């Protein structure tokens, strides 16, 4: 199809504002799509996405649309809405000319909506504001229109109003997309230049790559070269998604599609790479693709050490479709061989762990997450550590700096006081208060990332009944009074349970930690002391009592000395067992430790 009839666009929005449902309605309106094949969340292909009702992976689909007697080609990229997956949004925007900025009329513009707007503006994309859920009783359409007017300066009367659930206003939206999203500008006659914006591993085809052709064209059997790895492959299969995989012989400038080339070396494929023809050595790579840096770090260890090689293989495959994931191999004294991973947030961590367990049949234990600290030693040397157990002795440390993030919290007026108290309790530094509209405010705080990753978000949702939304961005490192708290079980240090806490909150955190461990670790045949220490000083302690076996049950009548003898023998046995016995940790221990009870 000629380029003037192609429209490449993404749908971006806050979580739960209806992106996937709107995608379903657009797919439903496309030419040639059979309605019997439609299912809810059509573009959410992972089981975990359907169960949680959220989008995790971006997904691109080609749709043929009719407008009057003209046919158009839409390339729609559905994107996640959660703050942890912002990098997926930035990847999809690199392949588009326009975006639909979708807002739920019952909730208004949220913190993540504004963050996504800035992403679109940075990429110089045409932004089409769209108001969804206008048919609901609680919808405040006029207020949302005014909020869009303040944010983007658009005429409130030109904003499309839709209900993705019922299909209201979808036809008008299609017309708006055709009129406002500019067609791609690529030249088919120029040498091939394509952006690799996503990939995944197929056990039969090898690596399957999703690309946007910016210049030239790509044909079946063409030889291609990856600009970064310099690897050369021959195209085996080529095609589009509509939303099912469909093979084609050629992809032209402006189009979005996929290819497989029998790629088995996973390291050859890097999302964000530029693809050119094999003989082309002069075409420069496409600019502007940013590498995303992890925010939190966590160790993953297989319960069965024999699964370690399977875990290594699984990590190589999963990183193909998740460029934000970083990992390196490590060994824990308590948990054995594993990988230390860098994630963008707690949801990202949960999703990766769940995918590893489901897709690769692994049983994993995850250590408590931490952030990356900068440590200045007394000899002037600087270290960067993301594993608390590697922190040097206190006598060698001059200062420890921790990452601070700028937090944006959008909330209704009447929760303002309680949220300010919450931020102060999490060592927040107040910056400013902004007015969004008559009854909504935006709080801006500087906060330590190490505090946010524990229970801040859950507590925020709890005290605001779910009405607050949160977004954050890295600001800077600040020197803080921090200490390493080590946990000892049965007088043995468990390195995977170490954590770093602020001096003012170390005792409180350590006490809670010990109490939780007491609840979560099952009773053994011997008594287990749980101790939290800073250096050589014990700051908190709990004890798990031994399981009592009634050794006198088989006695009847007779001499009391026989009973005493059996009890003494049991006592000696427990002492011996305590000296050599190891404490078994349940698999779900670490995830439960993260959930703050109060």
From Swiss-Prot:
Keywords: Cell membrane, GTP-binding, Hydrolase, Membrane, Nucleotide-binding, Protein biosynthesis. InterPro entries: EF-4, EFG_III/V, EFG_V-like, EFTu-like_2, G_TR_CS, LepA_C_sf, LepA_CTD, LepA_IV. It is found in: Cell membrane. Coiled coil: none annotated. SUPFAM superfamilies: EF-G C-terminal domain-like, P-loop containing nucleoside triphosphate hydrolases, Translation proteins. GO terms for biological process: positive regulation of translation. GO terms for molecular function: GTP binding; GTPase activity; ribosome binding; translation elongation factor activity. Residues 4-185 form the tr-type G domain. GO terms for cellular component: plasma membrane. CDD domains: EF4_II, EF4_III, LepA, lepA_C. It is an enzyme of class 3 (hydrolase). Its EC number is 3.6.5.n1. Its main location: membrane. Signal peptide: none annotated. It catalyses: GTP + H2O = GDP + phosphate + H(+). It comes from the Bacteria. Transmembrane segments: none annotated. Pfam families: EFG_C, GTP_EFTU, GTP_EFTU_D2, LepA_C. Belongs to the TRAFAC class translation factor GTPase superfamily. Classic translation factor GTPase family. LepA subfamily. Required for accurate and efficient protein synthesis under certain stress conditions. May act as a fidelity factor of the translation reaction, by catalyzing a one-codon backward translocation of tRNAs on improperly translocated ribosomes. Back-translocation proceeds from a post-translocation (POST) complex to a pre-translocation (PRE) complex, thus giving elongation factor G a second chance to translocate the tRNAs correctly. Binds to ribosomes in a GTP-dependent manner. HAMAP family: LepA (MF_00071). NCBIfam families: lepA, small_GTP. This is Elongation factor 4. It comes from Mycoplasma pneumoniae (strain ATCC 29342 / M129 / Subtype 1).
């Amino acid at each position: 199809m000629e380029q003037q009839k192609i429209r490449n666009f993404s749908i971006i929005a806050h979580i739960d504002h209806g992106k996937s449902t709107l995608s379903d309605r657009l797919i439903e309106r496309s030419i040639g799509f059979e309605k019997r094949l439609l299912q809810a969340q059509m573009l959410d292909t992972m089981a975990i996405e359907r169960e949680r009702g959220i989008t995790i992976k971006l997904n691109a689909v080609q749709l043929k649309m009719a407008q009057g007697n003209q046919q158009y080609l839409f390339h729609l990229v559905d994107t996640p809405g959660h703050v942890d997956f912002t990098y997926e949004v930035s990847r999809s925007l690199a392949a588009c000319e326009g975006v639909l900025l979708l807002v739920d009329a019952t909730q208004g513009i949220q913190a993540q909506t504004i963050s996504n707007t800035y992403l679109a503006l940075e990429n110089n994309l045409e932004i089409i504001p769209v108001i969804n859920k206008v048919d609901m009783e609680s919808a405040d359409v006029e207020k949302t229109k005014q909020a869009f007017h303040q944010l983007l300066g658009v005429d409130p009367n030109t904003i499309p109003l839709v209900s993705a659930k019922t299909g209201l206003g979808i036809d008008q939206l299609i017309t708006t997309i055709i009129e406002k999203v500019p067609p791609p500008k690529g030249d088919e006659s120029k040498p091939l230049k394509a952006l690799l914006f996503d990939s995944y591993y197929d056990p039969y085809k090898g690596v399957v790559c999703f690309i946007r052709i910016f210049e030239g064209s790509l044909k079946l059997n063409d030889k291609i070269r990856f600009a970064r790895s310099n690897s050369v492959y021959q195209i085996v299969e080529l095609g589009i998604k509509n939303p099912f995989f469909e093979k084609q012989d050629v992809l032209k400038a402006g189009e979005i599609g996929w290819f497989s080339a029998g790629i088995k070396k996973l390291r050859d494929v890097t999302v964000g790479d530029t693809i050119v023809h094999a003989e082309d050595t002069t075409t420069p790579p496409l600019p502007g693709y940013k590498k995303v840096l992890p925010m939190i770090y966590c160790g993953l260890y297989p319960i069965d050490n024999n699964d370690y090689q399977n875990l290594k293989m699984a990590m190589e495959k999963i990183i193909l479709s998740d460029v934000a994931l970083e990992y390196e191999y490590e060994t824990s004294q308590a948990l054995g061989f594993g990988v230390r991973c860098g994630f963008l947030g707690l949801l990202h961590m949960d999703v990766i762990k769940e995918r590893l367990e489901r897709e690769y049949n692994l049983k994993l234990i995850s250590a408590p997450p931490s952030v990356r600290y900068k440590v200045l030693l007394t000899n002037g040397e600087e270290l960067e550590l993301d594993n608390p157990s590697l922190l040097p002795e206190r006598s060698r440390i001059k200062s420890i700096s921790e990452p601070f993030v700028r937090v944006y919290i959008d909330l209704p007026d009447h929760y303002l006081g309680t949220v300010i108290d919450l931020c102060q309790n999490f060592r927040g530094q107040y910056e400013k208060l902004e007015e969004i509209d008559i009854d909504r405010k935006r709080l801006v705080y500087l906060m330590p990332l190490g505090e946010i990753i524990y229970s801040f978000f859950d507590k925020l949702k709890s005290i605001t009944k779910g009405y607050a939304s949160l977004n954050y961005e890295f600001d800077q490192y600040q020197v803080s009074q921090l200490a390493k708290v080590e946990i000892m079980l049965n007088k043995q240090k468990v390195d995977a349970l170490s954590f770093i806490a602020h001096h003012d909150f170390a005792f409180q955190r350590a006490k809670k930690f010990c109490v939780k461990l007491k609840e979560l670790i099952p009773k053994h045949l011997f008594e287990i002391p749980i101790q939290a220490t800073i250096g050589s000083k014990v700051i908190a302690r709990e004890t798990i009592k031994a399981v009592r076996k009634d050794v006198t049950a088989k006695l009847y009548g007779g001499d009391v000395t026989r009973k005493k003898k059996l009890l003494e023998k049991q006592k000696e046995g427990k002492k011996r067992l305590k000296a050599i016995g190891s404490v078994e940790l349940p698999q779900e221990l670490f995830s439960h430790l993260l959930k703050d009870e109060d």
